[in-house]
Amino acid sequence: RQMCIRDRSEVATMEDYLRWMSNVVIDSQGGHIQPLFGIGLEKSLPESFVDNLPGYRGMGPVRVGNQAQEHFQHDVYGNVILGAAQAFHDHRLLHRAGAREFRALERVGEQAVRVFDQPDAGMWELRTRARIHTSSAIMSWAACDRLAKIAATLKLPDRADYWAGHAEGMRERILKESWNEERQAFAESFGGRDMDASVLLMAEVGIVDPKDPRFISTVDELERVLCDGPYMRRYEAPDDFGRPETAFNICAFWRIDALARIGRKKEARAIFEAMLAVRNPLGLLSEDTHPVTGEMWGNFPQTYSMVGIINGAMRLSARWDSVI
């Protein structure tokens, strides 16, 4: 989301976002950050059931609040630092971050180092299964990689070397332990074989070159097992509710980004146009889409899905200097 704001040059919105993110970091206890807050930084969002409501099409229970506040989702540290890094590099900002903010971010980075190879609920907030998720490990790597770059910008060579060393060690382990030789793909978790669409983020965050044969074969395998036409499911393993039946819309946009990066732009554009066609009359997308009926499911409208539209449009658009 932060990259979407950055790339669209929404500077005022970006400054507000960075200010909110700074408050999260400053308020963190020993570097730990819970995966979600209330808009006013509320930490307690207890989940309860409304027993007298049947739920959508009788598919209860109806929940109030979100238990995910209690989860350990280790990708959060990389996401925080990826978002906050903009404050150190972007000369459009009225108030750029400096050494004080960097020291606060380093606490978050140390937490990323501690949890890098520890099981968690993953970005999908799984309630009954913990693994060392590849996507979480990737974000721990991103935390260290961006801290090294921030330190270089601040002319702190010792800290740059420190964080670059952590990043390189993590990268070696991720590429080794998440690779499944049988499937010729990066798997959902260390030592696993199940596929998960979130590994498509490897190219976007920069841990692998999109032209790396391993990444290209991963895209091929993900398309084989998770895609129904333009739609893409999150993962193939059963979750808390069984095997997923609906496609998760942001995954289709991750696929579009990956295809464009590896040179399959024509296919990426066709998928993008298919996703635009299932929006409602106001141009909005839900969280999920049923791959057979095209019916919208899940939270509506869904920020992730709308960010996917924006990022996809920018990825597929020609540069002005190529058309003028």
Specify the residue positions occupied by each region the protein language model found.
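Inter-helical turn/loop segments and adjacent helix faces that build the functional surface
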Residues: 8, 87-100, 119-127, 146-164
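Extended glycan-interaction surfaces of carbohydrate-active proteins
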Residues: 31-71, 83, 107-120, 168-249, ...
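C-terminal substrate/ligand-recognition segments
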Residues: 245-265
